[in-house]
């Protein structure tokens, strides 16, 4: 007999009913006679139930029914997969008549039709009319074994337990894999020698006679499943929209990283090129680490580190370093791949850790030697004579800028933001340059005086004057004086070039052209006043002026343009006249120059003749 219990209206979000929320998809839950327990009904329900006497009568014939069912199960286990209709009819005859009457389809349909409303009967008609899904075989059929009692195929809320399990699997890395590994360890797979054999029960058809053996399928499933495989449970999980995936198995990152570093170090030390080996044959063997001496996390690691530190502290560099070799002869050591970027890779931290005092002194000596070579180089001497020693001047200027607080900012930016500050800085710089120039001029005078005194002392050695003319000494003085003057002029020009450029830029930016003055005067005549800051006429200003005033402005501008054209023609005529006069003057100068050259040559010839006559 089937019992139908109405649920009524229940809020699935209420805390007390959340665990039963998945059972709210149908208005009725069917319980078969095999699923319904007597403890579910009260005494009053049993008395009101019209089928209570038939149940009592049914219990008397239950023993014969169980015996017949056990015989069917034994046949299935022995491999007798075929059951004839005669045997099924005979077995049904062994069942009492009361039980057969209670299981008749007509009586069940008539009782359900009396107890169900029309709407509910029409909705649940598919379950009653479908022979593949009878009302009492929901727990017997192997297709629906995994479902809980009262759970419908359509899941509203979802499998709460499955979702929680998935969240735990996402949080705990490697949960499933570790669980499966433990299960495989527990099973004695080494003892399996034969292949897996099937007993053929999966090929049985679900007939009316084999459905009776549905209760024992749970017991037989453990026997029929292959050894070492897990039982697959059929579920109706809610499709998850979570894009996260289960992470892979975890492994020990510490040991992996330690192995990686050890392997990398070994590769670096083993992949040294042969050239470097030939260049440095006297390397200490203690600098190269040994793989056998490395112990990760051991007590001997600290001792090894102390020994290495002591060896490094007591080490002395016997050979020259790459840096000093490159400084000594860059052409020779430029082919060495280790010395290509030596100067860029020179680091103070490396010096503090890897160099001794002796090596630093050697480096200092090498730098001094290189500086001496640079000083005695002819090209460097020519550059210093032509331009002068810029380094001292630049250093002094940088110091002065640092003291004034300019701090590597351009004077143009200072002049744009704060003109007073820029003027003060420029004034200080000009004063500094003037003092520098005065010092250099005094030094040149002292040098000239010393040279004159030396010449005089050389001419009056031992009180005997030497008969030498004064012409060579005057020539030397003239040369050194001109050289000093040229150097001073070059330095002044270099020092003032920035100031002059800034002044020109200011004049271009803030300078007032005559056209601007003319436009302002014309606008003032009309009655429009412009500030000194406004240098351009905007379109908005012109649109506000009336048409006759604009016409007057246009006429004034045309008159001014005509006057400018007249003055331009007059200035061009004057330029032509001046060019012609200049050509005449240059022609006259050329004649005079030729005359003087002729006179000089003739005078020299006369002097030569006179000298030869005196000598003769």
Curated annotation (Swiss-Prot):
Comp. bias regions, Acidic residues: 38-50
Residue ranges, annotated region (Disordered): 38-71, 204-251, 292-320
Biased amino acid composition, Polar residues: 62-71, 204-217
Disruption phenotype: Death during embryonic or early larval stages. Inactivation in adult eyes results in enlarged eyes with irregular bulging on the surface.
Keywords: Cell junction, Cell membrane, Coiled coil, Membrane
InterPro entries: SCHIP_1, SCHIP_1_C
Ranges in coiled-coil conformation: 550-594
Matching Pfam families: SCHIP-1_C
Family: Belongs to the SCHIP1 family.
Function per UniProt: Regulator of the Hippo/SWH (Sav/Wts/Hpo) signaling pathway, a signaling pathway that plays a pivotal role in organ size control and tumor suppression by restricting proliferation and promoting apoptosis. The core of this pathway is composed of a kinase cascade wherein Hippo (hpo), in complex with its regulatory protein Salvador (sav), phosphorylates and activates Warts (wts) in complex with its regulatory protein Mats, which in turn phosphorylates and inactivates the Yorkie (yki) oncoprotein. Schip1 promotes kinase activity of Tao and enhances phosphorylation of hpo by Tao.
Complexes and interactors: Interacts with ex; the interaction results in recruitment of Schip1 to the apical cell membrane. Interacts with Tao; the interaction enhances Tao kinase activity. Interacts with Mer.
Protein name as it appears in the record: Schwannomin-interacting protein 1 homolog
Originating organism: Drosophila melanogaster (Fruit fly)
Lineage: Eukaryota, Metazoa, Ecdysozoa, Arthropoda, Hexapoda
């Amino acid at each position: 007999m089937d019992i139908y219990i109405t649920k009524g209206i229940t809020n699935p979000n209420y805390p007390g009913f959340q665990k039963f929320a998945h059972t709210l998809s149908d208005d009725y839950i069917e319980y078969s006679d095999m699923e319904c327990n007597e403890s579910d009904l009260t005494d009053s329900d049993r008395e009101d139930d019209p089928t209570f006497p038939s149940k009592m009568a049914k219990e008397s014939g239950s023993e014969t029914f169980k015996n017949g069912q056990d015989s069917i199960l034994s046949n299935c286990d022995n491999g007798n997969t075929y059951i004839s209709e005669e045997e099924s009819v005979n077995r049904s005859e062994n069942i009492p008549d009361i039980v057969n009457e209670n299981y008749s389809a007509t009586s069940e349909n008539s009782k359900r039709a009396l107890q169900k409303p029309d709407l509910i009967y029409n909705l649940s008609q598919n379950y009653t009319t479908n022979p593949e899904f009878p009302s009492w075989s929901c727990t017997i059929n192997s297709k629906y074994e995994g479902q809980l009692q009262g759970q419908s195929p359509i899941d509203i809320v979802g499998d709460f337990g499955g979702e929680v399990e998935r969240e735990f699997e996402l949080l705990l890395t490697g949960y499933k894999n570790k669980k499966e590994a433990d299960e495989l360890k527990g099973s004695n797979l080494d003892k399996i020698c034969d292949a897996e054999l099937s007993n053929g029960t999966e090929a049985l058809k679900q007939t009316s006679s084999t459905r009776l053996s549905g209760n024992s399928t749970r017991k037989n499933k453990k026997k029929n499943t292959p050894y070492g495989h897990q039982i697959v449970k059929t579920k109706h999980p809610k499709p998850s929209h979570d894009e996260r995936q289960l992470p892979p198995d975890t492994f020990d990152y510490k040991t992996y990283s330690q192995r990686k570093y050890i392997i990398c170090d070994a590769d670096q030390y083993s992949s040294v090129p042969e050239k470097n080996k030939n260049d440095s044959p006297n390397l200490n063997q203690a600098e190269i680490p040994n793989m056998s001496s490395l112990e990760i996390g051991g007590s001997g690691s600290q001792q090894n580190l102390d020994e290495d530190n002591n060896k490094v502290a007591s080490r002395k560099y016997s050979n020259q370093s790459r840096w000093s070799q490159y400084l000594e002869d860059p052409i020779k050591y430029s082919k060495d791949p280790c010395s290509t970027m030596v100067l860029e890779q020179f680091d103070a931290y490396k010096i503090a850790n890897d160099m001794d005092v002796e090596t630093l002194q050697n480096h200092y000596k090498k730098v001094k030697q290189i500086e001496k070579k640079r000083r005695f180089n002819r090209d460097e001497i020519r550059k210093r004579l032509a331009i002068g020693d810029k380094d001292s001047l630049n250093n002094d200027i940088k110091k002065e800028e640092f003291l004034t607080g300019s701090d590597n900012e351009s004077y143009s930016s200072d002049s744009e933001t704060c003109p007073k500050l820029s003027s003060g800085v420029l004034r200080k710089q000009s004063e500094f340059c003037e003092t520098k120039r005065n010092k250099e001029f005094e030094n040149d005078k002292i040098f000239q005086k010393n040279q004159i005194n030396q010449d005089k002392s050389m001419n009056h050695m031992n009180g005997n004057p030497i008969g030498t003319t004064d012409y060579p000494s005057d020539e030397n003085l003239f040369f050194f004086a001109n050289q000093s003057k040229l150097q001073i002029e070059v330095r002044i020009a270099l020092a003032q070039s920035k100031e002059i450029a800034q002044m020109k830029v200011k004049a271009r930016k803030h300078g007032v052209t005559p056209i601007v003055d003319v436009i302002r005067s014309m606008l003032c005549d009309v009655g429009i006043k412009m500030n000194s800051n406004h240098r351009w006429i905007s379109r908005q200003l012109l649109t506000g002026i009336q048409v006759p005033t604009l016409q007057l402005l246009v006429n004034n501008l045309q008159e001014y343009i005509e006057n400018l054209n007249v003055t331009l023609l007059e200035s061009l005529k004057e330029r032509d006249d001046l060019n012609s006069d200049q050509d005449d003057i240059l022609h006259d100068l050329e004649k005079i120059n030729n005359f003087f050259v002729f006179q000089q040559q003739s005078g020299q010839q006369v002097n030569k003749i006179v000298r030869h006559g005196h000598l003769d």
